[in-house]
């Protein structure tokens, strides 16, 4: 999927960041056939904007902080584009179509995590969760993603699905932390 870089981003974009953006865009089929402008920001982790003229989306823009860039941030900003695009038609109610991603930061985090495990590399910013879950995110990421998927399913019948999700997150924090096997750094024997 093609994307355009702003002059500031051209100066700062690393190979790693370019690869991350390209890989993330592949997981957003809703954005196929559009050109996304990728800009640079210093203030926030990221931001997303849709420029409309006479009710037509003219430009889709995301701005990212290249330093400490995560898939979660890229996915979050791309999900904002989907939110804005879905709600661009102001003639109908925003809640009219349950298949659309609802507007809001917390909703954006939920839909981003549910989209693909790739976006679980860093804890979300807006979902309220216990400190232990945030601090030991790699141990909890898969469980949180499953809960986000369940929360989206619950949304059709349960109006307070975000509260349900946050309650479930508090429950998993009380259970002993799951141990995810990760290869430790290779230790070489010290020989004198």
Identify the residue ranges that each predicted region occupies.
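Post-HEXXH active-site segment of zinc metalloproteases
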Residues: 72, 84-118, 127
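Acidic/histidine-rich, surface-exposed loop or edge segments in extracytoplasmic proteins
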Residues: 2-7
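Catalytic zinc-binding patch centered on the HExxH motif and its immediate surroundings
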Residues: 26, 32-59
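Short pre-active-site segment immediately N-terminal to the catalytic Zn-binding motif
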Residues: 58-74, 98-100
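Long, well-structured alpha-helical subdomains associated
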Residues: 118-192
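Short active-site segment of divalent metal-dependent hydrolases/proteases
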Residues: 75-83
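Zn2+-dependent metallopeptidase catalytic core
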Residues: 12-32
């Amino acid at each position: 999927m093609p994307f355009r870089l702003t002059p500031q981003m051209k100066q700062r974009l690393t190979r790693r960041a370019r690869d991350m953006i390209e890989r993330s865009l592949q997981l957003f089929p809703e954005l196929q056939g559009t050109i996304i402008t990728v800009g640079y920001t210093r203030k926030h982790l990221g931001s997303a904007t849709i420029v409309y003229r006479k009710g037509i989306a003219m430009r889709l823009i995301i701005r990212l902080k290249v330093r400490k860039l995560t898939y979660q941030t890229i996915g979050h900003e791309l999900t904002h584009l989907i939110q804005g695009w879905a709600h661009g038609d102001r003639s109908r109610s925003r809640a009219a179509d349950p298949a659309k991603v609802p507007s809001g930061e917390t909703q954006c985090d939920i839909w981003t995590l549910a989209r693909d495990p790739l976006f679980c590399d860093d804890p979300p910013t807006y979902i309220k969760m216990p400190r232990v879950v945030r601090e030991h995110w790699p141990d909890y990421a898969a469980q949180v993603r499953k809960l986000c998927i369940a929360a989206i399913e619950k949304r059709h019948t349960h109006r307070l699905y975000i509260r349900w999700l946050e309650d479930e997150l508090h429950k998993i924090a009380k259970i002993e932390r799951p141990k995810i096997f990760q290869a430790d750094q290779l230790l070489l024997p010290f020989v004198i």
